[in-house]
Structures are given as structure tokens and as C-alpha cells.
Amino acid sequence: MAISKKMLTTFVLTILLAVSFVHCSDRTSGVGINQEYAKCYDLADCQKPKVDDAACERFCGAKSFLLYGKCDTATNKCCCKSKTK
């Protein structure tokens, strides 16, 4: 049984497509381009004189379990940052 030129071309193109898809896919958690997330929000609990880091931690944790929060006393804002690097 001979392999036709059309069948061989189809097979090669399928393999190339599969390989390029695997290289471009970022479905594995923890693999790929990691970016540091940092964003600050106005939160009443971070206003002076009452600075409540626990409230900021809860606020950021509600946005995503990958974030932690800390009140920035210089700007009076709650800053959420990523736990992973």
C-alpha cells in the first residue's frame, strides 16, 4: 500500500499544526510568562488614622486567592499584589 502525496502532505501539516499549538499554549499552571500583579485601590479601612491591614487582606483575597493585600500608608490605599513570582 503506497502513501499518496496528498496523504503525506496532510500528515505533515497536521503534525506541524499540533506542534505549534503545543508551543503556543499556556494551559499548564505555573508555566509561561509570569507577571507581577500590583494594583492599589481606595479603601476606607486604609485611611489614616485607622489602618487595618486585615481588611485590605480580605479585600484582595476576595478579588483572587492569588493576591495578598497591604495598606500603603504613604498613599492611604490598599495595594493588592500577587503571591507568586
Curated annotation (Swiss-Prot):
Residues 1-24 form the signal peptide. One of its GO terms (biological process) is killing of cells of another organism. Disulfide bonds join 40-80, 46-71, 56-78, 60-79. Its main location: secreted. It comes from the Eukaryota. GO terms for cellular component: extracellular region. Keywords: Antimicrobial, Disulfide bond, Fungicide, Plant defense, Secreted, Signal. It is found in: Secreted. Belongs to the DEFL family. This is Defensin-like protein 112.
